Amino acid sequence: TIPAFEEKYGIKVELIQAGTGELFKKLESEKEAPVADVIFGGSYTQYATHGELFENYTSKENDNVIKEYQNTTGYSTPYTLDGSVLIVNPDLTKGMNIEGYSDLLKPELKGKIATADPANSSSAFAQLTNMLQAQGGYKDDKAWSYVKDLFTLIDGKIGSSSSGVYKAVADGEMAVGLSYEDPAVKLLNDGANIKVVYPKEGTVFL
């Protein structure tokens, strides 16, 4: 996509890849002398709370988009829907039946569950949203108790980016990852030794 853009418009593109939180911190630090032109990724919440970092832009095709997915902020354009999934390494989970969030609270999975930091990764934030909704909602004490129990099992092994999560599972370093659909399915289609599990409790597409 980038080479085609460069060829058509004669513009050289410098691509910087990082976690969503890291990218927003970079934009914040450069706001007096902006360097970046476009950012991809992140969640609606992150854009809604950082409007001062962006110029207004609404695509001329906005009215042709389903109403629920139109640009409503004036500066952020939804471009994809991605669901939270569990990515499972079958070799490291033999004898375990992992179908949803409730199946992750197994003592034998301690230190073997990969996740990124919800404060820095939009997919990790989506996972936090999903598991809270699945366990009763944001205001439910039992839901937060589940999160506490899960992160106790995660045992401090919190990655800096979403890509590290699915790569760790595919490479056999971790047994289960809290990931999202697009890269997980791509890995599966490319022949990686993984299973993609849509949590039985339901999954949120953001």
Regions found by a protein language model. Give the residues of each.
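Short, catalytically relevant binding-site loops at active-site mouths
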Residues: 165, 182-186, 201-204
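Periplasmic-binding protein-like
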Residues: 146-151, 158-159, 190-206
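A ligand-binding cleft/hinge motif common to bilobed small-molecule-binding domains
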Residues: 45-50, 170-194
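Generic structural signal for residues in well-ordered beta-strands
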Residues: 13-15, 113, 194-196
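Conserved beta-strand termini and adjacent loop/short-helix elements that scaffold enzyme active sites
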Residues: 16-18, 116, 179, 199
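Extracytoplasmic ligand-binding site segments that recognize negatively charged/polar headgroups
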Residues: 1, 18-22, 28, 34-173
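Short, polar/charged alpha-helical segment
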Residues: 1-12, 187-188
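Short, structurally constrained coil/turn elements
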Residues: 7-9, 32, 109, 190
